[in-house]
Amino acid sequence: MRTKNNFAYIDGANLHKGAESLDWKFDYKRFRIWLREKYGVEQAYLFLGFVPKYKDLYTRLQEYGYTLVFKEVIFDGEGKAKGNCDADIVVRAMQDTYENKFTKAILVSSDGDFSPLVKFLISKNKIEVILSPYETKKCSVLLKRTGVKIAYIAEQQSILEHKKH
């Protein structure tokens, strides 16, 4: 851990879907600890759509140390929930940057829609790393083109895999 007071901005839907694509069970509690120990993350914002039936999960995530930022969910034509949190992540990260609330940002997403945010954070010397929930070939080329270091969650199985007790 090099610096402290780093903030993580986590695209909850992207992390969830990326974790589901792994051939091992992702552990959110271990992930929060790892963010603190490896990247000095003091504040981990987890952005997600609010679905009432998952309230027990939300409670557990808060107990693990995440700050949950909810977005109202809308449902598409097939009944799939959509949280659409991208703009919320961008606004929070930019606001925190302008208010100088953190040393470095860690972005957890594979979504190329965040490349303008990454470029902004580069211009302010405020980005540490992008943590991609998806493997390298599924991580957006737009993020790769920013030149920011990208680490792949799939490569951290020994640390982040849920262990049966």
What is each model feature region?
Residues 1-165:
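Terminal and domain-boundary accessory regions
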